[in-house]
Amino acid sequence: MDYDPAHAMSRGGSMRQTISRSVSKASRNMEDIFNTSSRRTKSVNEDEEALKWASIEKLPTYNRLRTSLMPELGEDDVYGNQILNKAVDVTKLDGEERQKFIDMVFKVAEQDNERILTKLRNRIDRVGIQLPTVEVRYDHLTVKADCYTGDRSLPSLLNAVRNMGEAALGMIGIRLAKKAQLTILKDVSGIVKPSRMTLLLGPPSSGKTTLLLALAGKLDKSLDVSGEVTYNGYRLNEFVPIKTSAYISQNDLHVGIMTVKETLDFSARCQGVGTRYDLLNELARREKDAGIFPEADVDLFMKASAAQGVKSSLITDYTLKILGLDICKDTIVGDDMMRGISGGQKKRVTTGEMIVGPTKTLFMDEISTGLDSSTTFQIVKCLQQIVHLTEATVLISLLQPAPETFDLFDDIILLSEGQIVYQGPRDHILEFFESFGFKCPERKGTADFLQEVTSKKDQEQYWVDPNRPYRYIPVSEFASSFKKFHVGSKLSNELSVPYDKSKSHKAALMFDKYSIKKTELLKSCWDKEWMLMKRNSFFYVFKTVQIIIIAAITSTLYLRTEMHTRNEIDANIYVGSLLFAMIVNMFNGLAEMAMTIQRLPVFYKQRDLLFHPPWTYTLPTFLLGIPISIFESTAWMVVTYYSIGYAPDAERFFKQFLIIFLIQQMAAGIFRFIASTCRTMTIANTGGVLVLLVVFLTGGFLLPRSEIPVWWRWAYWISPLSYAFNAITVNELFAPRWMNKMSGNSTTRLGTSVLNIWDVFDDKNWYWIGVGGLLGFTVIFNGFFTLALTYLDPLGKAQAILPKEEDEEAKGKAGSNKETEMESVSAKKGMVLPFTPLAMSFDDVKYFVDMPAEMREQGVQETRLQLLKGVTSAFRPGVLTALMGVSGAGKTTLMDVLAGRKTGGYIEGDVRVSGFPKKQETFARISGYCEQTDIHSPQVTVRESLIFSAFLRLAKEVSKEDKLMFVDQVMELVELVDLRDAIVGLPGVTGLSTEQRKRLTIAVELVANPSIIFMDEPTSGLDARAAAIVMRAVRNTVDTGRTVVCTIHQPSIDIFEAFDELLLMKRGGHVIYSGPLGRNSHKVVEYFESFPGVPKIPEKYNPATWMLEASSLAAELKLGVDFAELYKASALCQRNKALVQELSVPPQGATDLYFATQFSQNTWGQFKSCLWKQWWTYWRSPDYNLVRFIFTLATSLMIGSVFWQIGGKRSNVQDLTMVIGAIYAAVVFVGINNCSTVQPMVAVERTVFYREKAAGMYSAIPYAISQVTCELPYVLIQTTYYSLIIYSMVGFEWKASKFLWFIFINYFSFLYWTYYGMMTVSLTPNQQVASIFASAFYGIFNLFSGFFIPRPKIPKWWVWYYWICPVAWTIYGLITSQYGDVETPIALLGGAPGLTVKQYIKDQYGFESDYMGPVAGVLVGFTVFFAFIFAFCIKTLNFQSR
């Protein structure tokens, strides 16, 4: 092996090593406690040690491979340095023992990792074992994708309809639209070699992710792929590439309520130990033959890492340590709803999840996003040691590798525009570009140079050849020249000789789909699901409480003292209560749908990584739902059975309990199946309600079996509710109290007569047939759930969008003038729209929050925690200030406090703007704030986002033409012109890339023409070239005379030195430097070097990295100083105080900022702009509007065809009950669908609203009214075609007044349902809670709708709720408008001739035709009320916590 473990660290790492060595010196007094600790100890313990090893050698192989020596500190360790080793079973080590071992072996991760791996390698080499290696080759690999271009790529309603039509025609072979073909990778070839660290570099959209996916065998099936990828000569279809290699995604998908350690443990259990156990077995055999005893630490490490079937493995603790996650291992990962670990830590969990497995071929996609450079260096250093010492094959793409990290790599692959510009040793890459005439500047990182030198905009600045004029060298020229370059020709020669398959180690590739036995995988999944169930206990308690509350309401509504058993009418009330019990317990499963969908992204990731087969996930889910269901069913039965007064018979109680339990199980199964088929919340809400509609309509209770049209009768036999309804009614009505009485016509038993009225089979055996049916459906639906998870893929992949192609010739000409054009733009900026340059000064700023509960529990006495400690400084016009510090220093906190963005906490201190005290109302008008998270409306284009911001934030006096011109100039400034028509999209799902979103965030603030701009980490998550583009935009902004402050994480040299001044903070909210950077950062460097003991900055070292290391906590401990105190005592601090004093006095003749209004536009102007944006958002949300329209169409056709021409039947009560059933079903199902589909829409837009409101764009009321207004035309279209279809198919009387009433009542009913959904979102912190809150009232709305129990039968203590139930008024209006004037006689139950229809609906339901005016008024009132509450809550409730 050509790697030397003592390989000298790069110049970049030397500084860090100096500090880490000095910090760990104290802990290394008993250096290497496992090795012979001292001569004295050696002589004492040698024999004992040998005896212990000898006793282990005698054990049977199975036991020997589980037993090792565990170091144990003796009583006199501190004084006598005595180490005792005890024999332990590695599979039975508890968490504390494992942690103790890891802490002893890996004191300083990057140094000790190398030490232990070197020992491990030496042990393997000593007995001559060859490690399996994998060489990955790709030959002439080309990847193409079909995509729409220009306007056709926008997801509008029209395009969605066209796409659906084309897809349908495509199935029969007709192709209409020609899609453009986008080449992602263009004929690339190369080799990724084992035991060499390979770095993948390239600007955004160069195809890095596609290359990594192609090599890992995970490319999307829809892509057009040619060429081949081989592992050790084997094609991808000859083994299982997903188990042989691991692709580490740039998207962090994890279960939010699992802790970091649990996440890694589950991954380790699913991936197994691979060949580690076989290697250990062979190693132990050879050592035994050679009479060699291993070293205790390596032996324990290897045996514990190879231990199979353990719940928590040592390899997890090791991975946590080398990734620096050991500090947060017991913290939950968190998600949008729950605070967990930081973004950088989440990124490391994604990495850890894969490297915890046995796979040694890793393709890692942007693993450093959100990490500071020292953490990235540490992780890459540990990976380098793994690669060099265990001969792993690793290809890593990094965004902004610091020079010291870049130097850890052996090989570089440089990709640009889908072509390979260079692949080979790192040492020759600069030589390659120098051969063209490009040179990397002195103070520039090589990685940054490489990403910019192929870019048209950046190339010229690196041209150094004085003998030739510069010309743009395109990527294709670089790629073809590389093939002739000595590195390229050597690579071609290697590729021309095929890999000899016979040399491939038998353990190198995986040929089995799963790593461990299916029973073990089932056990792992069971443990995980059980844990998640316990964590989700609040959710289950909430569901049970909800069931108990509805049960209590039901039992007081149908109270036994009010219930009788005299005749059919009494029996019908009982049947109504049973029917309601069925429906409530059916809908109780609805929450299962939201939970399943929430878990799907993580499930798909783990399924595609072959962690476990889908059935090992679905089986525990189903089985663990049973006890919860038993508990909920028991709660329902105990509360309702005897209080309602069902048959007083224990057997019938348990029989009804069984039916309720099976309904819950069947419902959970059907909702899981719907969730797994629909895969998104909007479609699932719609699809789910459609399936339920079929089940309800054909269940035999809204429409008796014999009345169901012939064409729908088949559905009766496959509707689970028909079996449930038969069983539950037969159980009750066969009780003696019903069968011992005669019916009204005295020919049949009362119970039988009622069963005949409902068309239920009057046979006792139908109870057990019903039970069998429900049981069968439960199994079938859970089976379908498993099949759907097995074969369906996630929806909503990022779509490729090509903006309208521009004239190539114009493009060519524009290229060379770009820089001068940029300069002219920046010069004009201040002139086109004038602004007042403003300075900001702040003196002794402090910020407190209430002491967190966890800290109080640990005994902290203070009531407040101080996050900022007396910060004093100033920001000035035309000066670009960097706000820096380690994580937790308070950078973002200070910026939020100064910008007035904090929603809680206590602020002290003096903040002034150009000498006047800061007033937040006026400050919001003259300042901009670019948040770290790029929050934008997903359905508008880039240009529309900017127009919206400009029209709302620029002064009224600015003309429309000037505003539009300004928008175009800002797009030019931040280089967004090519993307002006691109849809923004959702982060990580569709639309713009991270870097494009970042530039849009800056542009949205710039179009407001602010004087002061705050930017929170504008370059985090960007590659070097993108960061350079963003910083160029920032610099251009400052040069117009604005005041700009940026928090910045770990900048490269050129980004750092683009700043003029620096405000440096340390952990705890203290300032340790505030002042100018100086040329080449000399002022900062001189300031810190002036303190005794601070090491000098190494040559060409990044001053930002040096400064953070030199002032770190570790450095303070070593030097015994506090840099905050040193700063306070410095002359620099005094100068700053003087500057702040000077800026705290207004200039001569200056007046305080004053605006006559809080917002730049009046309320009408705000409303118009908000409506404009909402209109486009709605138009481009086909997953909301088109799905809603399709659902309504399907519902109306279904109801129309089931209740075909039933509206004209009025001869008896059963006919009228069927019509009321049809109207009830239609109102409830379309209403609930409107309510649930609008929720995600409002939730997404509310997040954007918080940002825009904080920016002072508009007031909450115009925003809320615009969203309410947008619904009006869509609901009108929905109502019109719905009413036409239902009215004609059900066969109501064609009379203009009746039809218009029908449309009017339905329109306002659908509107109030929609606004009710919007209101629930505005009342709750997130969409999930809104969904649960809304569904809590569905049951109550149903119960009091007048369908299950008519108003005259409702007890007087509940009748008030009938009057405030919107659904009751809808049914009142619809029935009365159609039948309130009908004088035809109607036959009552039992066949007796009786009243007119008009009289019957008045007596039975309390509906009177004279009250149609008030009904209309009340329906309009509900609509206005829900809309008003929505607007009021949006205005007053803020669920954002900062």
Swiss-Prot record:
It is found in: Membrane. One of its GO terms (cellular component) is plasma membrane. It holds the Pfam family ABC_trans_N. GO terms for molecular function: ABC-type transporter activity; ATP binding; ATP hydrolysis activity; mRNA binding. Ubiquitous with higher levels in roots. Residues 169-442, 840-1092 form the ABC transporter domain. Residues 520-733, 1165-1379 form the ABC transmembrane type-2 domain. ATP 1 binds at residues 202-209. ATP 2 binds at residues 885-892. SUPFAM superfamilies: P-loop containing nucleoside triphosphate hydrolases. The chain crosses the membrane at residues 538-558, 573-593, 619-639, 657-677, 683-703, 714-734, 769-789, 1186-1206, 1218-1238, 1272-1292, 1299-1319, 1329-1349, 1357-1377, 1414-1434. Induction: Induced by cycloheximide (CHX) and cold/dark treatment. May be a general defense protein. Belongs to the ABC transporter superfamily. ABCG family. PDR (TC 3.A.1.205) subfamily. This is ABC transporter G family member 35. It comes from Arabidopsis thaliana (Mouse-ear cress). The lineage of its organism: Eukaryota, Viridiplantae, Streptophyta, Embryophyta, Tracheophyta.
